[in-house]
C-alpha cells in the first residue's frame, strides 16, 4: 500500500495562520512487510529518525498503540524547513498510516481535527488532508474551516537551499498589533478571500502583497522576497508572497507567464530551486 500527502503553503500573505493551499509536491510512504520493529527507510538525512521516534510512526502509534511494526519506505519531494508544510505532511501521513493498518475508518473531518491538535492550527494540515484551498480557524479547541476551489493560475515556487526554522521566523513577530492596524490587516485579508472566491486573482494578488500581519517582520530573514516580488510584478505576475514562515516565496501568475517567470527567477544570484507547481486537488490519498 502507498500513502501520498501533498505539500502545502500557508498564509498567502494576509491569511495568516488561517489560509492554506495544497501543492503538487508529495511525501510518499510505501507500507512494506510486517517486521519485528519499526523501520522507515529514507534518504532525507538531516537527523530524521529511522525508528519509531520518526514523526510519522510516532503519530501513528499515538492513535493506535498496538499497531504491528512494518518496514516503511518514505520518499519526499517536500524540502524541510522551507515553509512548504513538511511537518504537516509527516503528521498527516502518520494519521493515514494508523487509519490504514488499524482500520480506524476515520472521516476526513476527524483526520483534520487530529492533525490540527498536533500542529496547533489547521492552516497546513487541512489542505494536506482535503486538497485545494482551505480557510480555517481554531476557536476554543474546535476547528472551523471551509474548502473551496482555488482560481486557475500558475504557481512558481522559489525554494532557497538555506533552511529557515519556523521557530526562528515566529520569533521576529510582535506580541501585539495596534487596534487600528489589526483592523486594517483584517480588512485586507477579507478582500483577498472575497476576491479568490470571485476568481479575481488580480485583486487577490494585490491584497496578498499588502499583508500587515507578518511579512514586513519576516522580510528581514528573507531578504530575497522584495527582489523576487519586483521581478514577478515587472513581468505581469499577480503576486509573490512568503510560503508559510519562509524562506520559500510563492509566485502567483497567469499560466501563459509561467515559463518566462521561472527562467527569470532562475537567473537571480541566489542558490535556489525554482519549480512550476499546481494546486493539488485531492489531498492525502491511500493507494491499495
UniProtKB/Swiss-Prot annotation:
Record-listed E.C. numbers: 2.7.1.39
Positions with a binding annotation for ATP: 79-89
Molecular function in Gene Ontology: ATP binding; homoserine kinase activity
EC top class, as a word: transferase
Alphabetic keyword roster: Amino-acid biosynthesis, ATP-binding, Cytoplasm, Kinase, Nucleotide-binding, Threonine biosynthesis, Transferase
Catalytic activity: L-homoserine + ATP = O-phospho-L-homoserine + ADP + H(+)
One GO cellular component, as annotated: cytoplasm
Pathway where this protein functions: Amino-acid biosynthesis; L-threonine biosynthesis; L-threonine from L-aspartate: step 4/5
GO process terms (BP): threonine biosynthetic process
PANTHER family: HOMOSERINE KINASE, HOMOSERINE/4-DIPHOSPHOCYTIDYL-2-C-METHYL-D-ERYTHRITOL KINASE
Family per record: Belongs to the GHMP kinase family. Homoserine kinase subfamily.
Name of the protein described by the UniProt record: Homoserine kinase
Amino acid at each position: 500500500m502507498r500513502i501520498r500527502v501533498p505539500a502545502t503553503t500557508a498564509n498567502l500573505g494576509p491569511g495568516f495562520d488561517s489560509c492554506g493551499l495544497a501543492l503538487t509536491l508529495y511525501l510518499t510512504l510505501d507500507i512494506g512487510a510486517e517486521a519485528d520493529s519499526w523501520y522507515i527507510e529514507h534518504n532525507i538525512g538531516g537527523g530524521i529518525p529511522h525508528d519509531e521516534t520518526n514523526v510519522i510512526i510516532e503519530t501513528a502509534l499515538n492513535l493506535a498503540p498496538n499497531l504491528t511494526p512494518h518496514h516503511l519506505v518514505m520518499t519526499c519531494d517536500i524540502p524541510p524547513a522551507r515553509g512548504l508544510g513538511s511537518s504537516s505532511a509527516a503528521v498527516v501521513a502518520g494519521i493515514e498510516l494508523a487509519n490504514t493498518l488499524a482500520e480506524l475508518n476515520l472521516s476526513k473531518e476527524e483526520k483534520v481535527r487530529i492533525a490540527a491538535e498536533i500542529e496547533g492550527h489547521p492552516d497546513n494540515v487541512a489542505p494536506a488532508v482535503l486538497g485545494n484551498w482551505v480557510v480555517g480557524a481554531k476557536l476554543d479547541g474546535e476547528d472551523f474551516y471551509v474548502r473551496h476551489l482555488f482560481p486557475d493560475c500558475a504557481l512558481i515556487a522559489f525554494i532557497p537551499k538555506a533552511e529557515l526554522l519556523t521557530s526562528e521566523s515566529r520569533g521576529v513577530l510582535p506580541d501585539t498589533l495596534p487596534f487600528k492596524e489589526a483592523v486594517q490587516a483584517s480588512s485586507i485579508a477579507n478582500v483577498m478571500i472575497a476576491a479568490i472566491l470571485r476568481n479575481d486573482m488580480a485583486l487577490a494578488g494585490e491584497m496578498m502583497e499588502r499583508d500587515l500581519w507578518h511579512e514586513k517582520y519576516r522580510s528581514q530573514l528573507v531578504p530575497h522576497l522584495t527582489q523576487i516580488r519586483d521581478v514577478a510584478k515587472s513581468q505581469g505576475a499577480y503576486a509573490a508572497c512568503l510560503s508559510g514562515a519562509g524562506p520559500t516565496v510563492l509566485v502567483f501568475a497567469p499560466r501563459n507567464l509561467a515559463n518566462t517567470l521561472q527562467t527569470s527567477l532562475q537567473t537571480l544570484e541566489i542558490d535556489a530551486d525554482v519549480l512550476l507547481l499546481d494546486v493539488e486537488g485531492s489531498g492525502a490519498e491511500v493507494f491499495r
